[in-house]
């Protein structure tokens, strides 16, 4: 899947403000809205207030980044479209629980183990950058669902070469699963 988010958050040299005992990057207090990192080690703050506006199809996105999203989609000349933007904690809970149920049904594993497996593909509630209103999942021309097959397309190459110009990055590269916790 293609999950892009505005700006990047680069871990600095490890010290008491950026590294936990487990070695995972810790979000510094007071990080700017466009540098927020959300993952299993940095959940959404309970008091985080999204500034959302409605985008095509009723999806919501952060109002401070919507113009960059529109510009990126426009520059792609119809070869990409938005699949998923902001998700409420309730929706994330539903998606996660559905994945847990699927893992349990397919593997026979108990719930605790199924949750661990599910969390590698669907973020636990409160640990998805979609909960901020800054993450985007894109569908590429010719695809009706999220697929890794698009990685071999010219459109994917264009996105990787140009998304940073619009303030977006590929948030979960395949070779960084140990760092991001997301496959």
Q: For each of these PLM feature ranges, what is it?
A:
Residues 1-183:
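Extracytoplasmic cell-surface/polysaccharide-interacting catalytic and binding patches
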